[in-house]
A protein has these predicted regions:
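Substrate-binding pocket helix/loop in short-chain dehydrogenase/reductase
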Residues: 91-95, 99-104, 189, 200
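Short, small/polar-rich loop/turn modules that mediate ligand/substrate recognition or access, typified
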Residues: 75, 170, 175, 230-232, ...
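Active-site helix of classical SDR
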Residues: 118, 154, 162
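Residue(s) in the substrate-gating loop at a strand-loop-helix junction
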Residues: 138
Length: 244
């Protein structure tokens, strides 16, 4: 069976991706700083195979260990989903009030972490002549969302990184794409996010709140053989908000 690594896979969107991939026949490596036991148990209870791996994606040592663990346990690394992000701890405010420490932390996780995870899996994917990297960005990149410029800028960087890697890794048989969701309410969101969601829903033709499961079809498409000739792309999943 093919193997997929999902960073930030213990809860939220990452956990949804893990369950969907397991249901589609993937062996799943749940990578997170949080406890991965519940996610692994849920996958195994449904008949899938999974392991957990405590990982700080901003650490090269951790990401290299993650890749080695995945390959050692399941034999191949076929898909990497870079989902882990620094977001829920951010307090919205004017751009000039963002602390340097918070700016740096956001980039350490969202940008450096994504790059390090790609670096870690690359030797395995190159050796096997195939692989799929799926990076998670955000529609805030296109709207210039006010209040957290460091997060928006970090996610915009992900799209640039995706295009660079798609061009460089294509000859090795590796595709690299980005998926950009809109605001997706989850237990970690703040009251201000709930208010924002009301405005987001009003902007889109599909008049409802986006849920994590809305991402599954796109993720499985990019992880599967049907997308073998698709690379360097950013797929926006937001209920058509940008068509108005």
């Amino acid at each position: 069976m093919p193997t997929a690594i999902v960073t930030g896979g213990a809860r939220g969107l990452g956990r949804v991706y893990c369950l969907a991939l397991a249901g589609a026949g993937f062996d799943v490596v749940v990578a997170d700083l949080l406890d991965t036991g519940d996610a692994v148990d849920e996958i195994e209870a449904a008949g899938g195979r999974a392991i957990g791996c405590r990982t700080d994606i901003s650490s090269a040592t951790d990401t290299e260990a993650l890749a080695a663990t995945a390959a050692g346990e399941f034999g191949t690394i076929d898909v990497l989903i870079n989902n882990a992000a620094f977001y829920s701890q951010i307090v919205r405010g004017p751009f000039h009030e963002v602390s340097q420490a918070e700016w740096d932390k956001t980039f350490e996780v969202n940008v450096r972490g994504t790059w390090l995870a790609c670096c870690a899996v690359y030797p395995y994917m190159k050796e096997q002549g195939s692989g799929k990297i799926i990076n998670i960005a955000s529609t805030t990149c296109f709207k210039g969302t006010v209040g957290f410029p460091h997060y928006v800028t970090s996610k915009t960087a992900i799209i640039g990184l995706t295009r660079c890697l798609a061009a460089e890794l294509g000859p090795d048989g590796i595709t690299v794409n980005t998926v950009s969701p809109d605001l997706i309410p989850n237990p970690s969101l703040r009251p201000s996010d709930e208010v924002s969601d009301q405005f987001v829903v009003a902007e889109r033709p599909l008049k409802r709140t986006q849920v994590p499961e809305d991402m599954v079809g796109t993720i499985l498409y990019l992880a599967g053989r049907g997308s073998d000739f698709v690379t360097g792309q950013n797929i926006v999943v937001n209920g058509g908000a940008f068509c108005q």
